[in-house]
């Protein structure tokens, strides 16, 4: 996961 998506188990903050 590169962005915060609904239903995503892994949340990776990239900026």
Swiss-Prot record:
Subunit relationships: Part of the 50S ribosomal subunit.
* Extent of the signal sequence: none
MF GO annotations: rRNA binding
Query: Any idea what this protein is called?
Result: Large ribosomal subunit protein uL24
Q: Does the keyword Transferase apply?
A: no
| Recorded family membership | Belongs to the universal ribosomal protein uL24 family.
Query: What does this protein's UniProt record list under function?
Result: One of two assembly initiator proteins, it binds directly to the 5'-end of the 23S rRNA, where it nucleates assembly of the 50S subunit.
Keywords (A to Z) from UniProt: Ribonucleoprotein, Ribosomal protein, RNA-binding, rRNA-binding
Cellular component terms, GO, for this chain's entry? ribonucleoprotein complex; ribosome
């Amino acid at each position: 996961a590169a962005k915060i998506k609904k239903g995503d188990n892994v949340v990776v903050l990239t900026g």
